[in-house]
Regions:
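Hydrophobic transmembrane alpha-helices that form the core helical bundles
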Residues: 88, 101, 110-193, 198-201, ...
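A generic transmembrane alpha-helix motif of multi-pass inner-membrane proteins
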Residues: 225-228, 416-418, 445-499
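Membrane-interface loop-to-helix entry segments
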Residues: 170, 184-239, 268, 291-295, ...
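Membrane-interface "cap" regions at the ends of multi-pass membrane proteins
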Residues: 28-96, 110, 114, 139, ...
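Alpha-helical transmembrane segments
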Residues: 373-381, 426-444
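Helix-loop-helix junctions that connect adjacent transmembrane segments
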Residues: 55-60, 99, 180-188, 213-342
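Select transmembrane alpha-helical segments in multipass membrane proteins
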Residues: 62-73, 107, 139-156, 189-192, ...
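TM-loop-TM module centered on a large, flexible mid-protein loop between adjacent transmembrane helices
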Residues: 131-139, 143, 174-179, 245, ...
């Protein structure tokens, strides 16, 4: 739609548009009296945007409520991540001062979560970042480039994130399968990925029930670990700081950045419901509430869980452990209880990758519907009404990506995602507020623009301390995507803008 501002002799701004979108809005609101032929009061512009979003989500079923949304986010956030990364976080800073990385990560996640919340409430469609970048920069030169770059980096980072869950799953399976080889671990990854695709190959209402069931197992696992740690907590063990633990230096700054990178990998997922916004009931209220509740709940759980573990298992021993959760329970209750704990960790890991694939499979679908990706991904299952082609494609790519090492997967996925997704979204929110008055914002960021500034500084700090190899990877994937986009624009025939 191409709106142009015109003068209203009765007072107030109106917009002129002779396109079909406003005629459709008038059909929905026949009681509206237009000031002149072709003129529409500005309070109806949001209806036009909503009409475009409705066409994008046409055919999808809004089967997710608040409980399912929180379950989806928290299942994604609390996966295998903390159970396999606690030793890495401790090693990054060399002691219990690593808790600073977790706490700063929680602040960053909450600040960034407010960015997601306002964007998702204003644009409650399917696709998450793709949708926000497309709508925020629709009338600028970046309106085509940024959505394309997001899909481009997602081809790398999305399957990598899911694959990290597969790797963590097989790592804990080796607690039972002692002597597991690398080839056997890959077979486990393939089996888990195949089962996941089979479970997601169904309608969203059934998936919502599965998500809640998995979430219950996640909460039980975390509560057991936290309660056990509190009951056996030893402050002298938890706060056994090494000499010069808080001496600021270049090494301390780099270590803190590394700890925050790993912490944000563990926190990632607070926004997962945004990718399925077209399948959420009352998204303007449900999505912001679910994001904020998920971040606060998981931040509290992670803080208690980390203190619980390092308050029982000395940190010098913990950072060498391959099964920190199992070792923690075994120290307290013996090997049989540790076996149960390991099984629960596997349940938690599976719930996480289930939530990830559910959310990420909607991104290519939304891009295809908007004309920014291959049309085959816009297909819905004839009976289940879910994007089955996208589920299969992302699921298979994640299985392939799971053949790589865990540390490379974590660093590469964050380095490739920070610039085009997290930082670009902060500017997208500012763009919406300043240049898109036609879009209603039912939820507004608290203390704007302070949370956005905190999120921007935090993501830049993590990116710049991730290491030169991963900085180069993030920059090259972005530059490469821009070059591919330029070539694609030269080769393809122009596609009319949606709406």
């Amino acid at each position: 739609m191409d709106f142009s501002l015109c003068r209203n002799p009765r007072g107030g701004a109106v917009r002129r548009n002779s396109g079909p979108s406003i005629r459709r809005v008038h059909a929905r609101f026949p009681q509206t009296t237009y000031l002149r032929s072709g003129e529409v009061p500005s309070d109806l512009l949001y209806a036009a945007v909503s009409s475009r979003l409705s066409r994008q989500t046409e055919g999808l079923i809004r089967g997710f409520g608040f409980t399912e949304a929180v379950a989806l986010n928290m299942s994604n956030m609390v996966g295998a991540g903390p159970f396999i990364t606690i030793p890495l976080v401790i090693a990054s800073m060399g002691g219990p001062q690593c808790m600073l990385g977790w706490l700063l990560g929680a602040v960053l996640a909450l600040a960034d979560g407010l960015v997601w919340a306002e964007l998702a409430a204003a644009l409650p469609g399917t696709g998450g970042t793709y949708l926000y970048l497309r709508e925020a920069f629709r009338k600028t030169r970046l309106g085509g480039l940024l959505p394309f770059l997001f899909i481009w980096q997602f081809i790398f980072s999305g399957p990598l994130e899911i694959a990290s869950g597969y790797i963590g799953f097989s790592q804990y399976v080796s607690y039972f399968w002692r002597g597991m080889t690398a080839g056997e671990a890959r077979l486990v990854n393939v089996a888990v990925g195949t089962l996941l695709i089979a479970l997601l190959y169904r309608g969203i209402t059934a998936i919502g029930r599965i998500t809640v069931a998995l979430w219950v197992g996640v909460l039980f696992t975390m509560l057991w670990i936290v309660a056990s740690g509190i009951a056996h907590f030893h402050a002298s063990v938890a706060f056994d700081f090494p000499a010069h633990a808080f001496t600021f230096s270049a090494g301390f700054a780099a270590g803190l950045g590394s700890a925050m990178l790993i912490a944000m990998y563990d926190y990632m997922g607070y926004y997962d419901i945004c990718y399925t916004g077209g399948e959420v009931r009352d998204p303007a209220r449900t999505i912001p509430r679910s994001i904020i509740c998920s971040v606060l709940a998981v931040a509290a759980i992670y803080t208690l869980m980390n203190l619980s573990i390092i308050g029982v298992v000395p940190w010098r021993q913990a950072m060498q452990s391959k099964f920190i959760a199992s070792q923690f329970i075994e120290t307290l209750y013996g090997p049989k209880a540790a076996a149960v704990a390991t099984a629960l960790v596997l349940w938690t890991a599976f719930a996480s990758v289930f939530a990830l694939l559910l959310g990420y499979s909607r991104i290519p679908y939304a891009a295809a519907v908007g004309g920014h990706f291959f049309p085959v991904f816009a297909r819905l299952h004839p009976t289940g009404k879910f994007p089955h082609v996208s589920v299969l494609a992302i699921g298979l790519l994640a299985i392939v990506a799971s053949f790589w090492s865990l540390d490379a997967v974590i660093s590469a996925l964050l380095a490739s995602r920070i610039l085009v997704q997290f930082i670009a979204q902060i500017f997208a929110l500012d763009q919406l507020r300043r240049r898109r008055p036609d879009i209603n914002r039912p939820f507004r960021m608290w203390l704007y623009p302070v949370p956005g500034a905190i999120a921007f500084c935090g993501w830049c700090y993590i990116f710049l301390t991730s290491g030169w190899a991963y900085i180069a990877f993030g920059l090259l994937t972005t530059i490469g995507g821009a070059l591919v986009y330029a070539l694609w624009q030269r080769l393809r025939r122009p596609v009319p803008a949606a709406g």
